């Protein structure tokens, strides 16, 4: 089922969502008098990333992937030293230093941790360097295997066992190539941190298998930083999700609202009377864009200190009543998290997250619309 889901891609599930909303609009079940928007983080399927943990895992996976290549008949005479034990020892030493930080003092503990982390980066670099040679030889083996298969096909023959072995070899070679790219990136950002520089969060790698996941600081208690993709949800009075989108990293909220409302207008065939969102969207440009789209009431608190006129507007009874209704967007996101898989994507990458969240929205809207139609 997972292979079928990823093969169809996000376009298929997007089409299903569009068809469902179109059917609801045709049956006059899609209310757009009031709509609200909010953003959330869809966590990637990754453990909490640390430089030492990522490096130790990279060293171990390089060794296991190399063994897969050699077991499939590639680069059998190329030697690759297994550094996983040495990497594990250094990772455990870092954990021990952090546990004994109170006894050693903060400065001494930090120096010891950075020293061990630098050693781990060196081990990962050495493992990647050796694996590059093995990868080059394995690619030659793949070319030879494909040439042999072509010769057999020209004679009208077929070796099923060799084909399966070749498939395993190709998959292992591709996995090692991706792993080495990720390892080099993690080594580079670890070197930055060891030298006192903080890696750029927009490009920082936090996983070996999910290259699109990014650190996102939302300022939540208990979860100040989450790792995954940022999603926006737009729903109405009935709780139907009228629009959703997933973006990489932590883009600003404000520029996402007007395009979402445009899509809602296209689906419903009419303009929402009132649009509300939290203070993260509070910019004069957003109000102007929504007004130009035909929205009569834009109910979004402004960032910073408001002027006296703006303060008076935000204290009106209708404004405050709509703002109270807006808080239900957080409940909608919580409902998606608890019941429809938004608490963690099980498909890697940005495209995978879009597929996963799209299926969640489809199931959610089917329940809501069927209840309205009953």
Identify what each model region corresponds to.
Residues 2-374:
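Anion-binding and metal-coordination hotspots
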């Amino acid at each position: 089922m997972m292979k079928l889901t990823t093969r169809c891609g996000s376009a298929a599930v997007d089409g299903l969502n569009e068809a469902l909303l179109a059917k609801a609009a045709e049956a006059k079940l899609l209310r757009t008098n009031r709509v609200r928007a909010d953003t959330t983080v869809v966590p990637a399927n990754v453990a909490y990333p640390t430089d030492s943990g990522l490096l130790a895992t990279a060293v171990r996976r390089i060794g296991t992937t190399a063994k897969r290549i050699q077991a499939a008949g590639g680069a059998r005479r190329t030697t690759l030293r297994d550094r996983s034990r040495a990497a594990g020892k250094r990772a455990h030493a870092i954990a021990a230093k952090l546990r004994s930080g109170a006894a050693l003092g903060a400065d001494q503990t930090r120096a010891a941790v950075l020293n061990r982390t630098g050693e781990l980066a060196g081990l990962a670099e050495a493992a990647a360097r050796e694996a590059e040679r093995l990868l080059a030889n394995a690619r030659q083996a793949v070319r030879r295997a494909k040439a042999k298969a072509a010769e057999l096909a020209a004679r009208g023959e077929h070796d099923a066992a060799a084909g399966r072995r070749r498939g395993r070899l190709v998959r292992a070679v591709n996995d090692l190539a991706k792993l080495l790219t990720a390892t080099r990136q993690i080594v580079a950002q670890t070197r930055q941190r060891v030298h006192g520089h903080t890696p750029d969060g927009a490009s920082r790698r936090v996983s070996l298998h999910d290259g699109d996941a990014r650190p996102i600081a939302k300022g939540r208690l208990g979860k100040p930083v989450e790792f995954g993709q940022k999603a926006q949800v737009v729903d109405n009075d009935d709780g139907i999700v009228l629009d959703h989108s997933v973006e990489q990293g932590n883009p600003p909220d404000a520029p996402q609202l007007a395009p979402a409302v445009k899509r809602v207008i296209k689906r419903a065939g009419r303009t929402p009377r009132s649009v509300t969102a939290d203070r993260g969207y509070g910019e004069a440009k957003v109000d102007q864009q929504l007004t130009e789209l035909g929205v009569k009431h834009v109910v979004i608190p402004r960032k910073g200190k408001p002027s006296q006129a703006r303060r008076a507007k935000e204290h009106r009874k209708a404004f405050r009543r709509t703002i109270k209704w807006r808080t239900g967007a957080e409940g909608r996101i919580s409902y998606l998290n608890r019941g429809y898989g938004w608490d963690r994507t099980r498909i890697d990458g940005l495209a995978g997250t879009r597929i996963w969240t799209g299926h969640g929205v489809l199931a959610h809207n089917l329940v809501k619309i069927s209840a309205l139609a009953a």
